[in-house]
Amino acid sequence: MIITTWIMYILARKSIGLPFPPRVNSDIEVEETEAVSVVQHWLNKTEEEASRSIKEKISINDPCTQGHDIHVTRDLVKHRLSKCDMLTDPNQEVLEERTRIQFIRWSHTRIFQVPSEMMDDVIQERIDQVRRSVSHLRCDSSSDPCYRNSCSEC
């Protein structure tokens, strides 16, 4: 009975011109809400700190630009990791991706207008800040004996 019903169903679909099985996206989107919310909170906090820092610097250097909202130009900075770095700390890749995403999100944040002569200084300061944080993490991991052993193999 069940086999006959399935055969009739398949033949009916083919006679109408519909494919079997139906072309429906059967993938269920899975979202880890806790992980997403933690990452969003971390990124928002970092964005706010960067925005606050830039606003303070601008207000100190040029008070006449306050109140103007502009979109900061996008500047993608990718810091390449060596094989040795990847071998020593598997979480380094995740950290690097988060840092890159943070910088992209920061560069899209609406902030007070920066005079053109200050734009390069502000961008360079942010790039240096990201590099210092990555370098700080590397220094912390360099004191780890596992780091020394795996780097000597590189």
Curated annotation (Swiss-Prot):
Keywords from the UniProt entry: Cell projection, Cilium, Developmental protein, Differentiation, Flagellum, Membrane, Mitochondrion, Mitochondrion outer membrane, Phosphoprotein, Spermatogenesis, Transit peptide
Localization per record: Mitochondrion outer membrane; Mitochondrion; Cell projection, Cilium, Flagellum
Transit peptide location: 1-24
Any Pfam family matching the protein: SPATA19
Gene this chain is encoded by: Spata19
Tissue/organ expression: Expressed in the testis.
Source organism: Rattus norvegicus
InterPro entries per the UniProt record, alphabetical: SPATA19
GO biological process: cell differentiation; sperm mitochondrion organization; spermatogenesis
GO annotation, cellular component aspect: mitochondrial outer membrane; mitochondrion; sperm flagellum; sperm midpiece
Main location: mitochondrion
PANTHER family given in the database record: SPERMATOGENESIS-ASSOCIATED PROTEIN 19, MITOCHONDRIAL (PTHR36468:SF1)
Keyword Chloroplast part of the UniProt annotation: no
Modified residues (Phosphoserine): 26, 116
Biological role: Essential for sperm motility and male fertility. Plays an important role in sperm motility by regulating the organization and function of the mitochondria and is also required for correct sperm midpiece assembly.
Keyword Mitochondrion: yes
Name of this protein: Spermatogenesis-associated protein 19, mitochondrial
